[in-house]
Amino acid sequence: DIHFSLTFDEETACIGAPLLIKELKKRKITNGICIVGEPTEMKIIDSHKACDEYTTFFEGLAGHSSKPDEGVNAAEYASKYVNKLMSLRSDLINRKPKDSIFTPSYSTLSIGGIFGGIAHNVIADKCHVNWETRPVNKEDGIFLNSEIDKYAEKLLSEMKKKYPDASIKKKIIGERIGVFRVCR
């Protein structure tokens, strides 16, 4: 049998494929070949990187910008977090597998947005960072999350010295496993 299936909303919420998988299971369709037409422009591929998306929320203490020592600036801590992610991006490049079939050949990392603060003269009490990684292997995803989580604990410790209710919370938006070649 040949089955045609289409998904939707794969660039923003990524909800089409999980719904399709549930439906295929319900109908007991377990075929082993899939052709994905986007973003490859119908070029046949036999593997793809994983895609892990996160939003990290920072909560500090607002105050007037003329008295920075009386607040905990969530935007400043979010900036430190982003800087750490960027340094980890260099590590990911250095960890690239010698036999990688991907372009680029290493796990990628992207900051999709930084949002926080309400005015120039107000210490930002809230900020969040949208970011994603496209690991070429499971180990890179584990490495990246372990390193950034340790760093977030360090930042939170600093924040809590000034404001015990400060918080840093990483929310998983989606973690989609990669598909890797079985044969070369």
Predicted region positions:
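Metal-dependent amide/peptide-bond hydrolase catalytic core
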Residues: T55-R184
